[in-house]
């Protein structure tokens, strides 16, 4: 408990510094950096409670889901071609990077594909664990570098490259007329959504369940739900960030360090491809470049949606692109692997 309290205090203080400099998702980034440094250099066995992470995702899911209305559904229906086209581009870039890595390193092609696809770290880890032909060390290392690289670099790119700015908000209490406690009434609804999604084995159920439950309530009841208070979202960011930072595995990174340059280059190519496709989406659909880039960024879904919230971007569009790509990855990748890599495949 002492370790967790120390990590929490350090993360909070670093988050205050990032908040002062108007950095997007400051407390999530501070949690990732603090936990990563502590685990890599001091407490190699440090873990963050899954329950705390899931409670953070519950709050984040409500904050994201409340942005869905009848109007956003109509708007999203106009993006069908863009959503699927963007997803195929992301998959294509990932496969090219995986093939290049396979040709120049010791890793087999199956492991490289699982490692580079932006389909969710947890999902790819589970697939690697269940398939004896895949090298779990390779998959986890590549996915970790991709996720950390994107989550840490994208907020800075959005600010300094695309000219976005963080929407002013209170640190602990809401500003303006966003006061009251009506948001508390929605927490049980979001919780039920999380439970149902887990029962249905939905990917990333702890996040998607609350999003879907909140969105359904907002659309069916035709109400504009209250924003969650900043203190709730900041605590959610801290717990999500600390959990992500504790996912860093020093031993895995050292065992697969020869793959590190390829993982970094692959991540940069994915980000570059995201910017290029975002420009196409801006010209075709007329959406802001920040929204388009966060929608295309190669994960994670939670982090990109929270970054969009902090910068006033259209979170419903960001979520639509991110969730469709996530579902495509989780539904098509296992089928593709079974068809292309038969039982005799040895790498």
Model-identified regions with their sequence ranges:
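Membrane-interface helix termini and inter-helical loops of multi-pass transporters
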Residues: 70-78, 161-177, 222-229, 254-255, ...
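Membrane-embedded alpha-helical segments of transport systems
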Residues: 89-90, 120-124, 140-162, 301, ...
């Amino acid at each position: 408990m002492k370790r967790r309290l120390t990590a929490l205090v350090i993360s909070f203080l670093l988050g205050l510094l990032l908040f002062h400099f108007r950095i997007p998702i400051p407390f999530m980034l501070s949690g990732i950096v603090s936990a990563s440094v502590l685990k890599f250099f001091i407490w190699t066995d440090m873990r963050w409670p899954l329950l705390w992470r899931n409670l953070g995702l519950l709050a984040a899911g409500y904050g994201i889901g409340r942005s869905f209305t009848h109007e956003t559904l109509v708007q999203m229906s106009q993006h069908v071609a863009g959503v699927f086209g963007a997803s195929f581009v992301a998959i294509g870039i990932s496969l090219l990077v995986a093939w290049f890595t396979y040709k120049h390193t010791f890793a087999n092609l199956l492991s490289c594909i699982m490692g580079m696809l932006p389909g969710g770290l947890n999902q790819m880890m589970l697939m690697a664990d269940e398939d004896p032909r895949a090298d779990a060390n390779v998959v986890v290392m590549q996915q970790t570098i991709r996720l950390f690289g994107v989550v840490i670099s994208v907020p800075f790119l959005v600010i300094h490259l695309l000219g976005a700015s963080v929407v002013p908000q209170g640190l602990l209490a809401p500003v303006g007329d966003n006061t009251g406690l009506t948001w508390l009434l929605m927490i049980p609804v979001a919780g039920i959504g999380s439970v149902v999604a887990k029962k249905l084995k939905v990917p990333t159920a702890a996040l998607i369940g609350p999003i879907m439950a909140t969105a359904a309530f907002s659309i069916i009841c035709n109400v504009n739900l209250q924003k969650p208070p900043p203190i709730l979202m900041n605590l959610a960011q801290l717990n999500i960030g600390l959990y992500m930072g504790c996912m860093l595995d020093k031993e895995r990174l050292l065992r697969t360090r020869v793959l590190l340059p390829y993982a970094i280059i692959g991540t940069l190519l994915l980000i570059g491809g995201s910017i290029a496709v975002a420009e196409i989406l801006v010209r075709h659909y007329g959406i802001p470049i920040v929204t388009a880039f966060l929608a295309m960024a190669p994960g994670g879904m939670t982090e990109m949606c929270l970054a969009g919230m902090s910068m006033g971007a259209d979170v419903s569009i960001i979520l639509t692109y991110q969730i469709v790509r996530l579902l495509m990855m989780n539904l098509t990748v296992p089928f593709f692997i079974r068809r292309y890599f038969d039982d005799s495949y040895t790498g």
